């Protein structure tokens, strides 16, 4: 894990800090580097670490200081409250179901989706989407978020419709919740 952090830090150093003439990489924590990365690029990032390593502190700092149009979502109500955000299903007006990544299922989802204009406008103007507790998000739900953003933003060729994604979570904590039947449906796709 330590080598991955070092590699990540070096990549950020040459991509962001050198051009910006910021602090030396030795003077910054990985979370300070992640903050600079989110603030000064449009690239997506996965931020992980065990409890107490600064993930929530980074999120709070971004809420206050980030000039980007930003939304924070989480897979459950409790996680959304803790992150001061909303649930994924609420933001994207998704029913509580499996989302198989087939053309027929996608067409059906979009036909049934009824999103009010303010929410459509919010998604079209969105620049940064933070998903907290990402370890609890099933692959089909993440694919659906991608499909909805591509469609709503009229950018079908860009991942997540061109929205910068910040995935926060610890993959060693909670895993996605699904019944055995659900996993049987999802297994051929994921």
Regions flagged by a language model, labelled:
Residues 9, 13, 20-190:
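Conserved ATP-binding/catalytic motifs of P-loop helicase motor domains
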Residues 2-3:
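Polybasic, lysine-rich low-complexity intrinsically disordered segments
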């Amino acid at each position: 894990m330590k080598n991955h952090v070092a590699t990540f830090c070096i990549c950020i150093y040459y991509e962001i800090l050198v051009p910006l003439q910021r602090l030396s990489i030795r003077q910054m924590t990985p979370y300070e580097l992640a903050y600079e990365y989110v603030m000064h690029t449009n690239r997506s990032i996965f931020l992980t670490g065990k409890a107490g390593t600064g993930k929530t502190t980074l999120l709070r700092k971004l809420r206050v200081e980030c000039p980007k149009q930003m939304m924070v979502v989480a897979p459950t109500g409790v996680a959304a409250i803790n992150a001061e955000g909303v649930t994924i299903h609420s933001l994207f007006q998704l029913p509580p179901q499996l989302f198989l990544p087939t053309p027929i299922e996608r067409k059906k989802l979009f036909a049934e989706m009824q999103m009010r204009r303010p929410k459509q406008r919010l998604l079209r103007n969105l620049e940064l989407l933070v998903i907290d507790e990402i370890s609890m998000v099933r692959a089909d739900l993440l694919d659906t978020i991608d499909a909805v953003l591509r469609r709503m933003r009229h950018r079908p060729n860009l991942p997540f419709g061109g929205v910068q994604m910040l995935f926060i979570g610890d993959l060693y904590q909670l895993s996605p919740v699904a019944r055995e039947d659900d996993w049987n449906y999802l297994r051929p796709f994921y």
